[in-house]
Protein backbone atom coordinates (compact mmCIF):
# COMPACT_ATOMS: atom_id res chain seq x y z
CA UNK A 1 0.00 0.00 0.00
CA UNK A 2 1.42 3.37 -1.06
CA UNK A 3 1.49 6.54 1.00
CA UNK A 4 0.06 9.70 -0.58
CA UNK A 5 1.10 13.32 -0.06
CA UNK A 6 -1.43 16.17 -0.07
CA UNK A 7 -1.58 19.93 0.52
CA UNK A 8 -4.36 21.55 2.55
CA UNK A 9 -4.88 25.24 1.75
CA UNK A 10 -6.68 27.51 4.20
CA UNK A 11 -7.39 30.90 2.64
CA UNK A 12 -8.97 32.73 5.56
CA UNK A 13 -7.17 34.73 8.25
CA UNK A 14 -5.84 32.59 11.09
CA UNK A 15 -5.81 34.37 14.45
CA UNK A 16 -2.99 33.10 16.65
CA UNK A 17 -2.96 32.69 20.42
CA UNK A 18 -0.42 35.51 20.87
CA UNK A 19 -2.71 37.92 19.00
CA UNK A 20 -0.97 38.01 15.61
CA UNK A 21 -2.56 36.70 12.44
CA UNK A 22 -1.56 34.75 9.36
CA UNK A 23 -3.31 35.57 6.05
CA UNK A 24 -4.02 31.91 5.44
CA UNK A 25 -1.70 28.91 5.55
CA UNK A 26 -1.03 25.51 4.04
CA UNK A 27 -0.27 22.13 5.60
CA UNK A 28 1.42 19.26 3.83
CA UNK A 29 0.06 15.94 5.01
CA UNK A 30 0.72 12.29 4.25
CA UNK A 31 -1.85 9.50 4.33
CA UNK A 32 -1.73 5.72 4.21
CA UNK A 33 -4.77 3.45 3.99
CA UNK A 34 -8.39 4.34 3.30
CA UNK A 35 -11.20 5.91 5.29
CA UNK A 36 -14.02 3.51 6.07
CA UNK A 37 -17.65 4.34 5.35
CA UNK A 38 -18.15 5.85 8.82
CA UNK A 39 -14.88 7.86 8.44
CA UNK A 40 -13.81 6.88 11.96
CA UNK A 41 -10.93 4.42 11.41
CA UNK A 42 -8.42 7.25 11.74
CA UNK A 43 -5.00 7.16 13.37
CA UNK A 44 -3.54 10.69 13.49
CA UNK A 45 0.19 11.17 14.13
CA UNK A 46 1.78 14.33 15.55
CA UNK A 47 5.47 14.42 14.61
CA UNK A 48 8.40 15.62 16.74
CA UNK A 49 10.49 18.82 16.54
CA UNK A 50 12.41 18.22 13.31
CA UNK A 51 10.01 15.70 11.80
CA UNK A 52 7.89 15.83 8.68
CA UNK A 53 4.56 14.42 7.58
CA UNK A 54 6.35 11.35 6.18
CA UNK A 55 5.95 9.05 9.17
CA UNK A 56 7.18 6.13 7.05
CA UNK A 57 10.66 7.55 7.52
CA UNK A 58 10.67 7.22 11.31
CA UNK A 59 7.70 5.16 12.58
CA UNK A 60 6.85 2.76 9.76
CA UNK A 61 7.06 -0.29 12.05
CA UNK A 62 3.99 0.91 13.95
CA UNK A 63 2.01 1.35 10.75
CA UNK A 64 2.58 -1.94 8.98
CA UNK A 65 0.70 -5.21 8.62
CA UNK A 66 2.46 -6.61 11.70
CA UNK A 67 2.32 -3.39 13.69
CA UNK A 68 -0.49 -2.20 15.95
CA UNK A 69 -2.02 -0.09 13.18
CA UNK A 70 -2.43 -2.08 9.98
CA UNK A 71 -2.95 0.33 7.04
CA UNK A 72 -5.33 -2.17 5.43
CA UNK A 73 -7.68 -1.44 8.34
CA UNK A 74 -6.81 2.11 9.35
CA UNK A 75 -6.58 5.49 7.66
CA UNK A 76 -3.27 6.91 8.92
CA UNK A 77 -2.51 10.60 8.61
CA UNK A 78 0.30 12.92 9.65
CA UNK A 79 0.51 16.65 8.88
CA UNK A 80 3.70 18.71 8.93
CA UNK A 81 3.02 21.22 11.68
CA UNK A 82 2.49 24.93 11.12
CA UNK A 83 5.91 26.60 11.27
CA UNK A 84 7.60 23.54 9.82
CA UNK A 85 9.80 23.35 6.74
CA UNK A 86 8.50 20.25 4.99
CA UNK A 87 5.72 21.74 2.89
CA UNK A 88 3.71 23.61 5.53
CA UNK A 89 3.66 27.37 6.05
CA UNK A 90 6.72 28.48 8.00
CA UNK A 91 9.46 31.13 8.17
CA UNK A 92 10.75 30.37 4.65
CA UNK A 93 7.26 30.65 3.13
CA UNK A 94 6.29 33.69 1.10
CA UNK A 95 4.39 36.36 3.00
CA UNK A 96 1.53 37.30 0.64
CA UNK A 97 1.53 40.82 2.06
CA UNK A 98 4.92 41.68 0.54
CA UNK A 99 5.84 38.78 -1.73
CA UNK A 100 8.98 37.97 0.31
CA UNK A 101 9.82 35.15 2.74
CA UNK A 102 8.82 35.74 6.35
CA UNK A 103 12.26 34.92 7.77
CA UNK A 104 12.48 36.64 11.20
CA UNK A 105 9.01 38.17 10.78
CA UNK A 106 7.12 34.91 11.10
CA UNK A 107 4.77 35.35 14.08
CA UNK A 108 5.06 33.57 17.42
CA UNK A 109 3.06 30.33 17.40
CA UNK A 110 2.06 27.87 20.11
CA UNK A 111 0.97 24.25 20.25
CA UNK A 112 -2.55 25.58 20.60
CA UNK A 113 -2.20 27.28 17.21
CA UNK A 114 -0.81 24.11 15.65
CA UNK A 115 -3.70 21.93 16.81
CA UNK A 116 -6.14 24.59 15.59
CA UNK A 117 -4.72 24.11 12.09
CA UNK A 118 -4.88 20.33 12.47
CA UNK A 119 -8.52 20.64 13.46
CA UNK A 120 -9.27 22.75 10.39
CA UNK A 121 -7.72 19.99 8.28
CA UNK A 122 -9.79 17.38 10.13
CA UNK A 123 -12.96 19.32 9.36
CA UNK A 124 -11.95 19.70 5.71
CA UNK A 125 -11.60 15.90 5.51
CA UNK A 126 -15.03 15.48 7.17
CA UNK A 127 -13.59 13.35 9.97
CA UNK A 128 -15.81 13.58 13.04
CA UNK A 129 -13.99 11.05 15.21
CA UNK A 130 -10.32 10.09 15.43
CA UNK A 131 -9.83 6.61 16.82
CA UNK A 132 -6.21 7.10 17.94
CA UNK A 133 -4.11 10.25 18.31
CA UNK A 134 -0.42 9.49 18.83
CA UNK A 135 2.77 11.55 19.10
CA UNK A 136 6.07 11.85 20.92
CA UNK A 137 8.01 14.74 22.47
CA UNK A 138 6.77 18.01 20.90
CA UNK A 139 4.21 15.93 19.03
CA UNK A 140 3.10 14.45 22.34
CA UNK A 141 2.54 17.95 23.69
CA UNK A 142 0.23 18.55 20.74
CA UNK A 143 -1.60 15.29 21.44
CA UNK A 144 -2.43 16.50 24.96
CA UNK A 145 -3.34 20.00 23.79
CA UNK A 146 -5.65 18.80 21.04
CA UNK A 147 -7.37 16.24 23.29
CA UNK A 148 -8.13 19.04 25.75
CA UNK A 149 -9.28 21.46 23.07
CA UNK A 150 -11.57 18.98 21.30
CA UNK A 151 -12.42 16.26 23.85
CA UNK A 152 -15.30 14.75 21.87
CA UNK A 153 -13.18 14.00 18.80
CA UNK A 154 -10.76 11.40 20.21
CA UNK A 155 -11.40 7.87 21.42
CA UNK A 156 -7.81 7.01 22.42
CA UNK A 157 -4.66 9.10 22.81
CA UNK A 158 -1.05 7.92 23.08
CA UNK A 159 1.25 10.72 24.29
CA UNK A 160 4.86 9.50 24.40
CA UNK A 161 7.89 11.00 26.20
CA UNK A 162 6.11 14.30 26.75
CA UNK A 163 4.56 16.57 29.38
CA UNK A 164 1.65 18.81 30.31
CA UNK A 165 3.84 21.90 30.67
CA UNK A 166 7.42 22.31 29.50
CA UNK A 167 9.90 22.31 32.36
CA UNK A 168 12.50 24.95 33.31
CA UNK A 169 15.08 22.24 32.55
CA UNK A 170 13.74 21.76 29.04
CA UNK A 171 13.49 25.51 28.45
CA UNK A 172 17.12 25.92 29.56
CA UNK A 173 18.27 23.32 27.02
CA UNK A 174 16.30 25.07 24.28
CA UNK A 175 17.68 28.48 25.23
CA UNK A 176 21.24 27.14 25.05
CA UNK A 177 20.49 25.98 21.51
CA UNK A 178 19.00 29.34 20.54
CA UNK A 179 22.07 31.10 21.95
CA UNK A 180 24.19 28.98 19.62
CA UNK A 181 22.07 30.09 16.66
CA UNK A 182 22.19 33.74 17.76
CA UNK A 183 26.00 33.55 17.99
CA UNK A 184 26.20 32.79 14.27
CA UNK A 185 27.07 36.16 12.62
CA UNK A 186 24.76 35.35 9.68
CA UNK A 187 21.69 34.88 11.90
CA UNK A 188 20.27 38.37 11.35
CA UNK A 189 20.53 38.12 7.57
CA UNK A 190 17.42 37.53 5.49
CA UNK A 191 18.62 34.38 3.80
CA UNK A 192 17.42 30.78 3.82
CA UNK A 193 20.79 29.60 5.17
CA UNK A 194 21.10 32.27 7.87
CA UNK A 195 22.31 30.89 11.18
CA UNK A 196 23.15 27.50 9.70
CA UNK A 197 26.48 27.11 11.51
CA UNK A 198 24.71 28.02 14.74
CA UNK A 199 22.10 25.39 13.95
CA UNK A 200 24.83 22.75 13.78
CA UNK A 201 26.00 23.72 17.27
CA UNK A 202 22.41 23.83 18.50
CA UNK A 203 21.81 20.30 17.29
CA UNK A 204 24.94 19.09 19.07
CA UNK A 205 23.66 20.62 22.31
CA UNK A 206 20.27 19.05 21.75
CA UNK A 207 21.78 15.60 21.20
CA UNK A 208 23.11 15.63 24.76
CA UNK A 209 19.55 15.98 26.05
CA UNK A 210 18.11 13.44 23.61
CA UNK A 211 20.60 10.76 24.64
CA UNK A 212 22.34 10.00 27.97
CA UNK A 213 25.72 9.11 29.53
CA UNK A 214 25.45 5.41 28.71
CA UNK A 215 24.48 6.10 25.10
CA UNK A 216 27.78 7.75 24.28
CA UNK A 217 29.74 5.27 26.37
CA UNK A 218 28.30 2.33 24.44
CA UNK A 219 28.13 3.81 20.94
CA UNK A 220 31.12 6.18 20.77
CA UNK A 221 33.95 4.59 22.81
CA UNK A 222 37.56 5.01 21.78
CA UNK A 223 39.23 1.84 20.51
CA UNK A 224 42.77 2.97 21.30
CA UNK A 225 44.40 4.78 24.22
CA UNK A 226 46.80 6.98 22.27
CA UNK A 227 44.38 9.46 20.67
CA UNK A 228 44.80 13.16 21.55
CA UNK A 229 42.11 14.66 19.31
CA UNK A 230 39.27 13.82 16.91
CA UNK A 231 37.48 11.63 19.43
CA UNK A 232 34.54 9.56 18.22
CA UNK A 233 32.05 11.38 20.44
CA UNK A 234 33.26 14.72 19.06
CA UNK A 235 33.04 13.68 15.42
CA UNK A 236 29.61 12.17 16.09
CA UNK A 237 28.34 15.49 17.40
CA UNK A 238 29.67 17.28 14.32
CA UNK A 239 28.07 14.68 12.10
CA UNK A 240 24.67 15.18 13.75
CA UNK A 241 24.95 18.94 13.30
CA UNK A 242 25.83 18.61 9.62
CA UNK A 243 23.05 16.11 9.02
CA UNK A 244 20.37 18.41 10.42
CA UNK A 245 21.77 21.48 8.64
CA UNK A 246 21.39 19.63 5.33
CA UNK A 247 17.65 19.15 5.82
CA UNK A 248 16.43 21.92 8.13
CA UNK A 249 16.79 25.66 8.71
CA UNK A 250 17.65 27.78 11.73
CA UNK A 251 14.47 29.88 11.57
CA UNK A 252 12.19 26.87 11.96
CA UNK A 253 14.34 25.32 14.68
CA UNK A 254 14.34 28.58 16.64
CA UNK A 255 10.58 29.09 16.19
CA UNK A 256 9.54 25.55 17.14
CA UNK A 257 11.85 25.44 20.17
CA UNK A 258 10.09 28.60 21.41
CA UNK A 259 6.78 26.88 20.78
CA UNK A 260 7.88 23.94 22.91
CA UNK A 261 8.90 26.32 25.72
CA UNK A 262 5.45 27.94 25.79
CA UNK A 263 3.65 24.62 26.15
CA UNK A 264 1.43 24.74 29.22
CA UNK A 265 -2.03 23.22 28.99
CA UNK A 266 -3.13 25.16 32.06
CA UNK A 267 -2.75 28.55 30.36
CA UNK A 268 -6.14 30.33 30.37
CA UNK A 269 -7.77 27.16 31.73
CA UNK A 270 -7.42 27.63 35.47
CA UNK A 271 -4.62 25.13 36.07
CA UNK A 272 -2.84 22.21 34.46
CA UNK A 273 -4.82 19.67 36.48
CA UNK A 274 -8.14 21.31 35.60
CA UNK A 275 -7.20 21.31 31.92
CA UNK A 276 -6.28 17.63 31.94
CA UNK A 277 -9.65 16.75 33.46
CA UNK A 278 -11.26 17.95 30.23
CA UNK A 279 -9.84 15.01 28.26
CA UNK A 280 -12.42 12.32 27.49
CA UNK A 281 -10.20 9.92 25.54
CA UNK A 282 -8.75 6.82 27.15
CA UNK A 283 -4.99 7.46 27.36
CA UNK A 284 -1.92 5.28 27.07
CA UNK A 285 0.92 7.42 28.44
CA UNK A 286 4.40 6.15 27.57
CA UNK A 287 7.63 7.24 29.22
CA UNK A 288 11.27 6.25 28.79
CA UNK A 289 13.22 5.20 31.86
CA UNK A 290 16.42 7.17 31.13
CA UNK A 291 14.87 10.20 29.43
CA UNK A 292 16.84 13.28 30.55
CA UNK A 293 14.69 15.80 28.70
CA UNK A 294 11.21 14.53 29.59
CA UNK A 295 11.76 12.48 32.77
CA UNK A 296 9.22 9.81 33.67
CA UNK A 297 7.93 11.95 36.54
CA UNK A 298 6.27 14.07 33.84
CA UNK A 299 4.50 11.09 32.29
CA UNK A 300 3.45 9.88 35.73
CA UNK A 301 1.90 13.31 36.32
CA UNK A 302 -0.06 12.97 33.09
CA UNK A 303 -1.25 9.48 33.96
CA UNK A 304 -2.24 10.56 37.47
CA UNK A 305 -4.30 13.54 36.29
CA UNK A 306 -5.86 12.39 33.03
CA UNK A 307 -9.31 10.93 33.83
CA UNK A 308 -8.69 7.51 32.25
CA UNK A 309 -5.02 6.72 31.72
CA UNK A 310 -2.51 3.90 31.90
CA UNK A 311 1.24 4.51 32.27
CA UNK A 312 3.87 2.32 30.61
CA UNK A 313 7.63 2.92 30.80
CA UNK A 314 10.10 1.72 28.18
CA UNK A 315 13.77 1.05 28.78
CA UNK A 316 16.27 2.34 26.24
CA UNK A 317 19.96 2.94 25.90
CA UNK A 318 19.01 5.95 23.78
CA UNK A 319 17.22 8.03 26.41
CA UNK A 320 14.62 10.44 25.01
CA UNK A 321 15.29 9.27 21.46
CA UNK A 322 14.14 5.81 22.51
CA UNK A 323 10.65 6.55 21.19
CA UNK A 324 12.20 6.74 17.71
CA UNK A 325 14.39 3.66 18.20
CA UNK A 326 12.63 1.06 20.38
CA UNK A 327 10.00 0.01 17.85
CA UNK A 328 9.56 -3.50 19.21
CA UNK A 329 8.95 -2.32 22.78
CA UNK A 330 6.58 0.42 21.68
CA UNK A 331 4.69 -1.93 19.39
CA UNK A 332 4.18 -4.47 22.17
CA UNK A 333 3.09 -1.80 24.66
CA UNK A 334 0.47 -0.48 22.25
CA UNK A 335 -0.76 -3.94 21.27
CA UNK A 336 -1.10 -5.02 24.89
CA UNK A 337 -3.01 -1.84 25.74
CA UNK A 338 -5.62 -2.47 23.07
CA UNK A 339 -5.69 -6.21 23.73
CA UNK A 340 -6.66 -5.55 27.35
CA UNK A 341 -9.38 -3.15 26.23
CA UNK A 342 -10.65 -5.76 23.78
CA UNK A 343 -10.68 -8.44 26.48
CA UNK A 344 -12.49 -6.13 28.90
CA UNK A 345 -15.11 -5.43 26.25
CA UNK A 346 -15.58 -9.14 25.60
CA UNK A 347 -15.95 -9.79 29.31
CA UNK A 348 -18.80 -7.31 29.47
CA UNK A 349 -20.47 -8.79 26.36
CA UNK A 350 -21.25 -5.33 25.03
CA UNK A 351 -19.80 -5.32 21.52
CA UNK A 352 -17.18 -6.92 19.29
CA UNK A 353 -13.45 -6.61 20.09
CA UNK A 354 -11.36 -3.81 18.67
CA UNK A 355 -9.65 -4.40 15.36
CA UNK A 356 -6.09 -4.56 16.70
CA UNK A 357 -3.50 -7.18 15.73
CA UNK A 358 -2.46 -9.32 18.69
What are these regions (language model features)?
Residues 1-42:
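Catalytic-loop region of hydrolases
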Residues 30-96:
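N-terminal cap/lid subdomain of alpha/beta-hydrolase-fold enzymes
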Residues 101, 105, 112-132:
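Conserved acidic catalytic loop of the alpha/beta-hydrolase fold
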Residues 129-168:
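Conserved hydrolase catalytic core segment
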Residues 153-155, 159-243:
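Alpha/beta-hydrolase-fold enzymes
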Residues 268-272, 281, 295-304:
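Short alpha-helix in the alpha/beta-hydrolase fold that links the catalytic acid
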Residues 279, 285-287:
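Short beta-strand/loop motif that positions the catalytic acidic residue
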Residues 300-301, 308-358:
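Catalytic active-site module of serine/aspartate enzymes centered on a nucleophile-bearing elbow/loop
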